[in-house]
Amino acid sequence: MKKKVISVHKNPNGQIPYMGEFYQLETDTIVNKCLPGLGATTSEILADRDSIIVVPNTPVITGKCKAHKKDNLFGVMAKIMPDDIANYLYDTFAEGKHVKIMTTPESFWKVKQAFQEVGRSMYSCFLMWDECDKLTKDVDYREAITLPLDDFFQFPNKVMVSATPLHPSDPRFENFTWIQMVPEFDYRKDIHIIQTNNVLQCLKDMLSEGQDRPLFIFLNKTDMILALINKLSIQEESAVFCSEKSVDKLKAKGFKSTYVDWNPEKAKKYNFLTSRFFTAVDIILKEKPDVLIVTEPYLSDFTLMDPHTDVIQSIGRFRNGTNLIAHVVTVNEDFPIRTVEGINEYFNGAKMAYETVESLYSATTSEEARRALHDALEQLSFNGMITNGKPDHFKMDNYRDDALVKTAYHDMDLLIAAYESTGSFNLHIETPHLYAYGDYERLKLENASKSIKQKRKQIVEILDTLEIVDDTPLKDEYLEELRTVDRFIVDAYYKVGKKVIEASGYRVKPITEAMILKDYQTQANGIEMVKLLKNSFHIGQRYTLKFVKDELVRLYALLGITPPDHEKITAQTIRKFFKVKDCWIKNKKTGKSDRGFKIIESII
């Protein structure tokens, strides 16, 4: 791909000019604006030609159509159908105006069908694909985003534009020219990097200091957004801008101030935005807001913000500038460190494995063998990088990009290096906000696949860590959260300690017994024997006479007491405490049946 450099200079009044003032979009180019807000989309809307503009999300369309009511701009969204577009085209041609259509990739087919209905060629239009990095970024969960690409290459006049474009590996771009905008002034933004191991608590501490101006928080996880809003008790002061599904989800949970489109009238003191609003949307405010970017990879990979794209784009939404910018981040050392070269080798190996199994599938005549090989093909990683039987370059680019972003979040040194390589920031590395109870520990406790014993062991480890922390309201909050997970083990820790719990194998019965004995040793009140008996014998259960006698002897010995009048302890002694019924219990070792008691009810 050829490269062309365009210098960008400020106007005599010190303002950054709109792109249309110093550069006109050229066909077969990928334009790296470098600076968000250069007005590339607006320039094309106003250009003296027919235009089709592809944008990543509908909030962009809503905002641009509202701003360009007099410019014949027609927005194609979910409810707009080909007939609606056809009627717009008929009116536009009749009035001698320029076609100005803005659509998402998923709705592009409607535009194509509408042109066919009116008997005109859409290829006579100039096609601008805005925020083209989204082709790579989103294709893993928006497969339809690349559907218009085959049509894109048939347009004689076409361009891809972004402030953060990614180099595509698709060979159809080989003859394109990369247009690199180079600002001839310092355009870097100050950003504060705050490492933490407990995002919610860190944000709570930061925001509890008071907020004088509007705050915009970019966080691509609605569950975390709601948790933060509830933790801070800022329900009435918060608004969330997100997708339709997330709006429904939040409203179902009782939070009503949530919207699918940006509207300054809906903004509040605390404004949360998901990835739908990371790019292209114009946020115009009277005062410069504070901006927080939040990343918590332990809770969700979706919160990862790529310094080369997502961070730059998010900050660029504010057309009148920003005040404080901070990135609150947790890193995850479980993410593997990968390189471009290594990932390309992975592709080669994955492709080789796929082609080997595919050749076996083609050569096999057995129906069952073909079924097995087909299932094997479906499971191979390279299968996810194929569309219509051919390697999908954008899916491969997406895999590569995703792996490199995760690499950046392996540790703080790699993240800082990623930020520095953008050339877009002045970094201010703040003192880490580290807590005794972090998101990693919380995640392990919430892991449904862990056994009760594993979770209890984790809680004891956390409690051990908290022991060195001074008593504060925050520590009390942690303890209460742990009690909601397993109150028994928290109470046991503070009554009998870690060693007793470990020696008991984290089992309820011996731990409970130890707790009862502890009470007896410190504040005997005469009911300890009752507690021990109920801990050992349970209503509805069957016990052999031998077990009953041995257990009673053990419990009396634990407390150092004897039955009244030094009565001999036998299995029948159980009748003083429980109503029992004679029964037979099969011995699994001998195959014979032993006499026993079934516990009917307690009489103590």
Protein language model annotation of sequence segments:
Residues 36, 40-80, 106, 167-169, ...:
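Conserved Walker A/P-loop ATP-binding site and its immediately adjacent core
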Residues 298-325:
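Conserved SF2 helicase motif VI
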Residues 44-47, 346-604:
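The feature captures the C-terminal accessory region of ATP-dependent helicases
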Residues 163-208:
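Interdomain hinge/linker at the junction between the two RecA-like core domains of SF2 helicases
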